[in-house]
Amino acid sequence: GIRISEARNLQDTDVHLDENYLVIKGAKNMTDRIVPISQSLSNVCRQYVYYRERLPLKIDKKYFFLSLSGRKCGANHTIFRWFRLILKDAGIPFTGNHHGPRIHDLRHTFSLYAMEKMTREGSDMYHSMPVLATYLGHKTTQSTEHYVRLCRVMFPELERKVEFINQQIYPELEYG
């Protein structure tokens, strides 16, 4: 759920793999925040560090993510190029022209599933929104609402109820 620029600017001292969290400093809204990460992501990051330390280069130990030259991970276009290669390897078509998929879509997907999980665990949506906003580094919940759109995945029971009501109101339409 972090921004590309936040990942690029992570320093080794910001990454706490034993405790499963990142410290995001001076983000888009000039705020710092702590972002928990999963054990599986910590494990992947440990593997990354293992191989990074074996690069036959003089590396800049300050930044966590490095380019193949050993310096801070480069410009966004380099990251986008790698993302497109990953999409291709996964068999996911890249349509380009801002139609995606985009790296930023991962942030939207994370937001949607985080909200769905909180709702499934019994949290009220309106109480969950500020939690998610803080996690994403948003100043307001309005920014977060842009990321979280109500969808069928989040509320299957509501969908069933609405479908039943629609069948009563518009019986001539086919449903299901």
Model-predicted segments: where are they?
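A short, glycine-centered helix-capping/turn motif at helix boundaries
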Residues: 1-9, 117-118, 126, 138
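Conserved tyrosine-mediated DNA breakage-rejoining catalytic core shared by Y-recombinases
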Residues: 3-5, 9-43
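Short, structured motif recognition centered on aromatic/hydrophobic residues
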Residues: 7, 40-49, 65, 80-84, ...
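Catalytic-site neighborhood detector that most strongly recognizes the C-terminal catalytic loop/helix
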Residues: 26, 136-161
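C-terminal catalytic core of Y-nucleophile DNA break-rejoin enzymes
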Residues: 29-46, 62-84, 98, 102
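Short amphipathic alpha-helical linker/capping segments at the junctions of internal repeats
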Residues: 63-68, 152-155, 165-169
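Short, basic (Lys/Arg/His-rich) helix/loop patches that form interaction surfaces
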Residues: 81-134
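C-terminal secondary-structure termini that scaffold catalytic or DNA-interacting sites
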Residues: 162-176
